[in-house]
Amino acid sequence: MSVDLFDVKGKIALVTGSTHGLGMAMAKGLGLAGATIVVNGNSSQDKIDSAIAEYEKEGIKAVGYKFNVAKEDEVQAAVSKIEAEVGPIDILINNAGIIKRTPLLEMEVADFKEVVDIDLVSPFIVSKHVVKNMVERKAGKVINICSMMSELGRNSVGAYAAAKGGLKMLTQNMATEWAKYNIQVNGIGPGYFATSQTAPIRVDGHPFNDFIINRTPAAKWGDPNDLAGAAIFLSSKASDFVNGHVVYVDGGILATIGKPSNEE
C-alpha cells in the first residue's frame, strides 16, 4: 500500500476550536503532514494569533479566523472569506465544543440549550456552509468530533452526552446524504487525554485518575498526539470508501465493561 494514500499535502483544513487542546493536536497532525491549517476560535484574536505562532514554530502553514460557530451569519461570512482568501476548504473538522457538569435535575434549560447549540447545532451550521462548496467540487472530508459519551451515559454530563449522541447520528445522516457527491463524513471519539485541563486530576491517588487508569485497558491517559493518525486517515484518500463511522481513540475503554479495582 502506497503512503500516498495518506497524503494531505496542499490540502486546506478548517479545524474549529483549534487554538488549544485536542483541536490543536489534530490540526498539528494534519499540518505536519502538509496541510494548510485554518485556525478558528471565538475568545479573542490574540489567542488565535498566539496559536498561529505555535503552529508556525513547527513549520506548519496556518491562518486564523475568529467566528462563533453557533451563529450562522458569522459562519457563512467566514467560510466565504476563507475560500476567497485561502482557497477551497478540502477538510473540515468540527471540533469546537463545551461541557457543563451539572446533574440534570439541577440544570437550567438555558445551560442545556447552550451545550446542544455548540456541540450539536454548530457542526450542522458549519458543515452546511462548507459542504455546499464541496458539493460543487465533488470532493471533501468532514470529521465530527464525537465522544465516548456518544455511546455511554455518565453522571452530570447529560446535556453533553445528548449532544454527542446526536452528533453521532448527524454524522451518519450527513454521510447518507452527501456520499453521492464524493464527500466522506466520519467522526472521531476521543477517550480521556492528558491535557492542561486534566492536569490537576492526573496525579497518583486522585480518585478519578485511579478510575481512568483502571477503566482503560491501555492503563494510561491518551497523548493528544494519538489523535493525529485518525485525523490524517479520515482526511486522506485512504478513507475514500469509509463513510458514517466513528473511530474511537480511547485506549480500549468502549471495548470492555471494565474490571474490579482489585484485579491486576
Swiss-Prot record:
Record's catalysed reaction(s): 2-dehydro-3-deoxy-D-gluconate + NAD(+) = 3-deoxy-D-glycero-2,5-hexodiulosonate + NADH + H(+)
PROSITE patterns: ADH_SHORT
Residues annotated as the enzyme's active site: 160
MF GO annotations: 2-dehydro-3-deoxy-D-gluconate 5-dehydrogenase activity
Domain of life (superkingdom): Bacteria
Subcellular location: Cytoplasm
Record carries keyword NADP: yes
Keywords noted in UniProt: Carbohydrate metabolism, Cytoplasm, NAD, NADP, Oxidoreductase
Binding site for NAD(+): 14-38
Binding positions for substrate per the UniProt entry: 147
Annotated GO CC locations: cytoplasm
Pfam families assigned: adh_short
CDD domains in UniProt: Ga5DH-like_SDR_c
Broad enzyme group: oxidoreductase
EC number(s) recorded for this UniProt protein: 1.1.1.127
Inducing stimuli: By ulvan and rhamnose.
Tagged with keyword ATP-binding: no
Role of this protein: 2-dehydro-3-deoxy-D-gluconate 5-dehydrogenase involved in ulvan degradation. Ulvan is the main polysaccharide component of the Ulvales (green seaweed) cell wall. It is composed of disaccharide building blocks comprising 3-sulfated rhamnose (Rha3S) linked to D-glucuronic acid (GlcA), L-iduronic acid (IduA), or D-xylose (Xyl). Catalyzes the reversible reduction of 2,5-diketo-3-deoxygluconate (DKII or 4,6-dihydroxy-2,5-dioxohexanoate) into 2-keto-3-deoxygluconate (KDG or 2-dehydro-3-deoxygluconate) with a concomitant oxidation of NADH.
Subunit structure: Homotetramer.
Family named by the database record: Belongs to the short-chain dehydrogenases/reductases (SDR) family.
Protein's name according to its UniProt entry: 2-dehydro-3-deoxy-D-gluconate 5-dehydrogenase
Organism expressing this protein natively: Formosa agariphila (strain DSM 15362 / KCTC 12365 / LMG 23005 / KMM 3901 / M-2Alg 35-1)
Lineage: Bacteria, Pseudomonadati, Bacteroidota, Flavobacteriia, Flavobacteriales
Gene name linked to the record: kduD
